[in-house]
Amino acid sequence: MDVSQLTDAELRDSLKSHGVSVGPIVATTRKLYEKKLIKLSDGSINNQSNLNDSQFNEDSLIISSSPKKSPPQRVFQNVSAATAAATTSPESDSDDCEESMRYLTEEEMAADRASARQAQSNKGGFLGSTITFTILFVFIAVFAYFLIENAEQLKLVAETNPEDTI
């Protein structure tokens, strides 16, 4: 069997039939998946779970009782292919890392364009924004004028009554 001639979907299906969890097949991952399939079809890997991720079981931690200080040995239990297949559904979009989409009909595109035009016409245009900006500028200018006038009066009051300070 020539693995390089398989399409991405055929490669994915054949790997899934061997119990291998398959991610997206792109140019960078295709050769890796082809090698896995060749090893599986040749029978050089008898245990399929070596290709899948292993799951660490905390109960199976073994600590060596030797006098030298060596790091503890960890025992990993492999997840069976049936358990791995049961946790992911083959029909979900996340298996292929693709999102579903559909083409819009002409009526839907026309309705979308009409709502975009409606939203833009409700903005008020250039004249409305100019009037709003002018009113805001006048309000800020009047506020600044009264602030400066009152600051001068407060300064004069503070200078005439020096005995009020402690």
UniProtKB/Swiss-Prot annotation:
Q: Tell me where it mainly resides.
A: nucleus
GO-annotated molecular function: lamin binding
The record ties this protein, via PROSITE patterns, to:
LEM
Q: Which residues form a coiled coil?
A: none
User: In which tissues or organs does this protein occur?
Assistant: Ubiquitous. Expressed in all cells, except in cells undergoing spermatogenesis. High expression in hypodermis, neurons, pharyngeal muscle, body wall muscle and gonadal sheath.
Query: Which cellular compartments is it found in?
Result: Nucleus inner membrane; Nucleus envelope
Does Iron count among this protein's keywords?
no
Hey, which stretches end up on the Nuclear side? 1-127
Q: Name one GO biological process term.
A: chromosome segregation
Quaternary state and interactors: Interacts with lmn-1 and baf-1.
For the region Disordered, what residue ranges are annotated? 62-99
Designated name of the protein: Emerin homolog 1
SUPFAM superfamilies linked to this entry = LEM domain (SSF63451)
Tell me the null mutant phenotype.
Mild increase in embryonic lethality of progeny of X-ray-irradiated adults. Slightly more spherical nuclei. Simultaneous knockout of emr-1 and lem-2 leads to embryonic lethality, 8.5% shorter animals in larval stage L2, abnormal gonads and a developmental stop at late L2/early L3. Missing cell divisions in the postembryonic mesodermal lineage and failure to produce any of the differentiated M lineage cells. Defects in the organization of chromatin, nuclear intermediate filaments, and nuclear pore complexes (NPCs), and defects in mitosis in cells that continue to divide after embryogenesis.
